Amino acid sequence: MPPVCGRRCSRTGEVRRYPGSFVRKWKRVETANGPRFRSVVAPHEVALLKHLVGALLGLLNERESSSPLDELEVITGIKAGNAQRPEDPTLRRLLPDFYTPDDKDQLDPAALDAVDSLNAALRSLHEPEIVDAKRSAAQQLLDTLPESDGRLELTEASANAWIAAVNDLRLALGVILEIDRPAPERVPAGHPLSVHFDVYQWLTVLQEYLVLALMAT
C-alpha cells in the first residue's frame, strides 16, 4: 500500500485524501463479545461508499446473470459459473484467470488452448463461490454504514468484510485509472481523473488503517 502522505488537519491530525474528506483512524476496543473497531465517517463519505458499492454489486450481479443455465444445476442445485473470461475490464480485474503460465507469451496455439480450457473449467467450478463472497462482503459494508451520526462500530468479521470490499473498490477504480502495481502517489494537477485518484487514495488509507487496527493487540 502507498504510504499515508495526505495533508494533515492541524486540529485533529486526520489525513485528508480528497476534497472535503478526512481519513480517521480506527480505534480497537476490547469487549466481552470480542473486539470492536470504531471510527467516524462523514455523510458525503457514506454516500460515496453507497454509490461505489452499489456499482460493484451491479457488476457482480450482471456477471452472475450471464452464466448459462445448466441442467445439472437444476438437478443438483449446484451453481455453475460462466466459463468465459469477462469482457468488461473491471470484471476481468475482479475475476482474473485462475492460472497464467509465466511463459504464456511463448506458448504455441495448442498450449494456449489448453490454458484457456483449464481456466474455463476452473471458472465454471469456482467463480460462483467467489462472486458470492465478494457480494457478501460488499453487502456487509452497506449494512454497517451509519444512517445518521456517522459513528461506525464493526465486529472482527465485519471489519474483515470491509477490508475485502474496499479492496474490490480499489481494484475497480484502478482499472479506470489504469493503475498497475505499484500505484503512483499522485496524478498531475488538472488531470481529468484526479478526483477518481483522490478517492482511490482515500480508500487505500481507509483500508490500511483498518488492517492496522485488526493487527493491533
UniProtKB/Swiss-Prot annotation:
Keywords: Disulfide bond, Redox-active center, Stress response, Transcription, Transcription regulation
Disulfide cysteine pairs (residue numbers): C5-C9
InterPro entries: AosR
Top-level taxonomic group: Bacteria
Motif CXXXC positions after renumbering to this chain: 5-9
Any Pfam family: DUF2017
Keyword Nuclease: no
Similarity section: Belongs to the AosR family.
Protein name: Putative oxidative stress regulator AosR
